[in-house]
């Protein structure tokens, strides 16, 4: 069973194509990657993301497998009306589905909006580290500074005219790549809880 399109059943990360607006984490969190990577139990079921890739997603523009954006749909309907279904299926596997550069203008507008952003560093506080069924992730506490991120996210959503359904802000630390044996589920919970105790109320900077 494959749990996520981003990882295979051997714990190796696969190519996964799309466009996303992210905020990179500036802190060195290599110890988290190592904790998962070298933990005898966690490493049997989870593949850690490289600490250099840790980030918070601000807005998901589009990725393989998601419904097409209006820009992509309109291009297909105008240029390939009789191949619509076939191309929609093709978009789920094809690298970057941008036929005729149909979403370039949208990407430029989003990029411009991001460049106009004036906030400097944003400091967030960790609420908890938890296992949500497919990933180990960090959730953040509600601070007034999140209003800046929410406002930016709303502007990006308005430009795309598409709600991405992302949910709450989080940092993904690793993905599950195989089923957890029943006798080790409690051990997994304990090992994740150790990480939770180490990180709760710690801060990091975007």
Predicted regions and their residues:
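Histidine-dependent nucleotide/RNA phosphoesterase domain, centered on the 2H-phosphoesterase fold
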Residues: 1-206
